[in-house]
Amino acid sequence: MNLNVEKILIIGLGMIGSSIALASKSKGIKVYGFDKSNNSIKEALEKNIIDSKVESILDINSKDFVKKVDLIIVAVPPKQTLDVLNDLKDIWNTDVTITDTSSVKNHIKLNGASNIILSHPIAGSDQSGISAANGDLFKNKKNVLCDPFNSKKGHFEKVDNFWKNALQMRTSSMSVTEHDLIFAMTSHLPHLVSYALIDSIRLSNHDVDDNAGGGLKEFLRLSGSNSEMWRDIFMLNRVD
């Protein structure tokens, strides 16, 4: 298996997916893109964020397309990640490597997927959408890799090399259980508190703008993050 990544497909052209695309293109990697929104595809092509578009998941599952790319990155909200990975079942256990960007992992349960490595690039913004794409978003940031499916030799190394070389990230690895517990404390809980605090202030009907300190402004910034993504994270990384 060739561990070099020269051509990739990104599924999901929001802020994360588009930022990966820009960083990859800056390293000479050819980028294919797919998104359920035709407007996002159009904008990505117009802004030269991607090189070529893919029309459908059916096209991605074809044997001919698998030969065109070295790596597929699923960059959609967490709840959709499992659905998309299952939609790609026809290309499980092939030489093309598949990874994701979800910040919660415990719900991703797949049987017989030896070419899937889970990734969590720890970088983000309170902005969202393709208009927030930033090719330097991931530079010098950390990426946590999980290999819960006992991947075939070479796939982990390929993903690890991609994040390090193309996006200039630092990588580490841990189990899914450890990952979700750590990020529940260091990321998910702070965001949950920020949403609760800002909502409480809104419901109080008090004008606090003139008395807002730096701490509140940081909570305001966190609460401005993509609400769909964070709803998924809170629902998926919880203990009933």
What are the roles of these predicted feature ranges?
Residues 69:
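An anion/phosphate-binding loop that grips the pyrophosphate of nucleotide cofactors and donors
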Residues 135-222:
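Internal alpha-helical scaffold of NAD(P)-dependent oxidoreductase catalytic cores
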Residues 36-37, 76-77, 101:
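Short beta->alpha hinge that forms the Motif I/post-I loop of the SAM-binding pocket
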Residues 7, 30, 115, 142, ...:
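Residues at the starts of beta-strands that form the adenosine-phosphate
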Residues 1-64:
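NAD(P)+-binding Rossmann beta1-loop-alpha1 motif at the extreme N-terminus of oxidoreductases
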